[in-house]
């Protein structure tokens, strides 16, 4: 603004001088020549003003050229940066490709390991396939759990879809904002153009008005009009300067907006390129994620199968331990049974020995019984002969003697029977028999002893008795508890003896007496 004001001040001074000079020369020169010279000076000043303005505009042009060079350098720097960014992105892309190849190699190695493990698991599965039917219910429960997991994965998919929808909405918002920005830039440019046109029209109108007023007032008030014209010219120049400044500012703003627009366009292109690259990478990553999820699912299935196999093996180990425990218990039971078997065999041997002894005793008793029957038959024959004849003392003596012999014979048989029983019971008692067997042996002993005592009380004669008069028979009471421990042969012999001693009316029965076959052949 300083160089603009200086020419105006110089113009005012020259105008003052010109007015003074004109006043001095007014008397010498004509008014027409003075007007021509003033017009020349006026136009000369205008030319100087315009030259000054041209110089200023040239300086501004130089400054704009320098700025353009700077902008060009910045543009080249941005291009270099773009190239470096592209190279960096290419390097990162190559690194990612290398990482992907490494991941593929790892995936292949994992697949090989998985195939090996799968073969091993299939072999194990073939070994225990027939046992998996028992855990069908467990597998159904696991399928239910997997269904729950699948529902959770479905929820994850829905969340992913929501995120993709949000991403699309953000993209739409970005496009909308870009459109709004373009409209805003277009409106600014339109406004600047309209402002320029309006200012141009206003300037033209003002110049026309000034020219018309100058023509009107030139004839009447030349000096005032010139002064006013100069003042208006100054004001117009000031307004033009303001307008030019405003235009320069608008141009600068326009250039800045264009630069920002170019930058934004470049950024938009870069973002679109990066978006495309990221979309491709995202697609590749999605494929990799799907592959990895599939592999992870397969690995989880493999781990679940291994867990199932481990559980099955643990169950089998528990079953094996239970079987071992059962086997140990069975072995202990077997040992106990073997010990019991040995005891039973020993007892069977002992019983066999007792049986042989009993058979021997039975044979002896049979002989004794046969002898007793023969003696009883002799007694019966003798008694029948005595009934036919008279009473004979000799017969009575013979009968008593035979009865004594029979009593001795029976008592010897009873002693032979009771002695082995007592010996056998004495042998059995240290071996720890039952209380019932001990009670039976004790009662048998007591019965045999009581029977012997009763038989021993029978005497053949008394002091002072010659046997001429028959004595009153002594009845031996037969008690069941006394006869129960005795054998069948002994009991039959006692019954025969009692019937022989007391022949009340059963002599005919004794005459027809014979041993039954089961008794003779009994073992």
Curated annotation (Swiss-Prot):
Q: Which residues form a coiled coil?
A: 32-191, 248-274, 302-371
Question: Where are residues bearing Phosphothreonine located in the sequence?
Answer: 30
Glycoprotein among keywords: no
- Residues annotated as region Disordered? 1-31, 419-440
Q: Could you tell me which InterPro entries the record lists for this protein?
A: CFAP157
- Give a Gene Ontology cellular component term annotated to this protein: cytoplasm
What is the first-listed, main subcellular location in coarse terms? Answer: cytoplasm
**Which UniProt keywords are present, listed alphabetically?**
Cell projection, Cilium, Coiled coil, Cytoplasm, Cytoskeleton, Differentiation, Phosphoprotein, Spermatogenesis
What do mutants without this gene show?
A: Mice were born at expected Mendelian ratios and appear normal but homozygous males are infertile. Spermatozoa display impaired motility due to defects in the axoneme. Sperm cells show an axonemal loop of the midpiece, supernumerary axonemes and a disrupted axonemal arrangement, as well as defective axonemes along the flagella.
| Subcellular location(s) per record | Cytoplasm, Cytoskeleton, Cilium basal body
- For this entry, list what GO says about its biological process: sperm axoneme assembly
Q: What induces it?
A: Expression is activated by FOXJ1.
MF terms (GO), sorted A to Z: microtubule binding
User: In what ranges is there compositional bias, type Polar residues?
Assistant: 429-440
Specify residue ranges for compositional bias: Basic and acidic residues: 10-26
Q: Kindly indicate whether the keyword Phosphoprotein belongs to this entry.
A: yes
Assembly with partners or alone: Interacts with TUBB and TUBA4A. Interacts with CEP350.
Q: To which protein family does this belong?
A: Belongs to the CFAP157 family.
**Function (record text):** Specifically required during spermatogenesis for flagellum morphogenesis and sperm motility. May be required to suppress the formation of supernumerary axonemes and ensure a correct ultrastructure.
Q: What is this protein called?
A: Cilia- and flagella-associated protein 157
Show the taxonomic lineage.
Answer: Eukaryota, Metazoa, Chordata, Craniata, Vertebrata
